[in-house]
């Protein structure tokens, strides 16, 4: 219906789709720098960190981590909306059996967490991932360990959109998506 609708591509809303096994193993030349970050994390913190599934008693610490993470970020509607969405998920966690939340503790302090759920039997969706940016390799570690532990058998991972945030876009592209799931808006003429 090209005469009736205008079609507008929404690049900022495209979802990033990845091969899950590549993110779990970080194997291959494309993932060399990510594997180096992960190995650096393991060398520095290997005997001081613990990955585990988070429970409701951990959620206040996760919110504090989000707040620490956001301290040096420009406040905008995306950050406010994300925090409200995370709080809502945490409040309703007992009614969301498909939702998985995992975190990395270093010296008993929560320094990274991620949460997601299954879109279908083959695809996990990662909604939120936060980590202390001062800790080298922590993002690579939470990405890898969360998938290994919570979604060990999915074939694909959807890490959602970048909202037009340049740093987020670069981070998502650095994990070499196999596809961008395009999104469009239709406007009636």
For each feature predicted by the language model, list its residue ranges.
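Conserved phosphate-coordination/catalytic loops
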Residues: 32, 80-84, 137
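Aromatic (often tryptophan-rich) hydrophobic motifs at membrane interfaces
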Residues: 98-188
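Short loop/helix-cap segments at secondary-structure boundaries that form the rim of catalytic
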Residues: 1-2, 172
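Short secondary-structure capping/turn micro-motifs that flank functional sites
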Residues: 58, 188-189
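A mid-sequence, solvent-exposed acidic-amphipathic segment
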Residues: 56, 62, 66-125
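A generic secondary-structure signal
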Residues: 40, 68, 91-92, 145-149
């Amino acid at each position: 219906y090209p005469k009736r609708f205008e079609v507008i591509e929404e690049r900022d809303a495209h979802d990033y789709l990845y091969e899950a096994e590549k993110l779990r193993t970080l194997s291959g030349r494309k993932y060399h720098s990510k594997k180096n970050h992960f190995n650096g994390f393991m060398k520095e913190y290997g005997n001081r960190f613990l990955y585990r599934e988070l429970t409701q008693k951990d959620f206040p610490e996760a919110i504090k981590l989000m707040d620490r993470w956001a301290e040096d970020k420009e406040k905008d509607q995306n950050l406010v909306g994300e925090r409200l969405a995370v709080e809502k998920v945490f409040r309703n966690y007992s009614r969301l059996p498909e939702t998985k939340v995992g975190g990395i503790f270093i010296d008993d302090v929560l320094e990274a967490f991620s949460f997601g759920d299954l879109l279908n039997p083959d695809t996990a969706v990662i909604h939120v991932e936060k980590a202390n940016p001062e800790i080298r390799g922590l993002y690579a570690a939470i990405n890898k360990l969360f998938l290994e532990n919570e979604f060990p058998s999915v074939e694909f991972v959807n890490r959602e959109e970048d909202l037009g945030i340049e740093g987020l876009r670069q981070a998502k592209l650095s994990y070499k998506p196999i596809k961008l799931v395009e999104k469009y808006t239709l406007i009636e003429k």
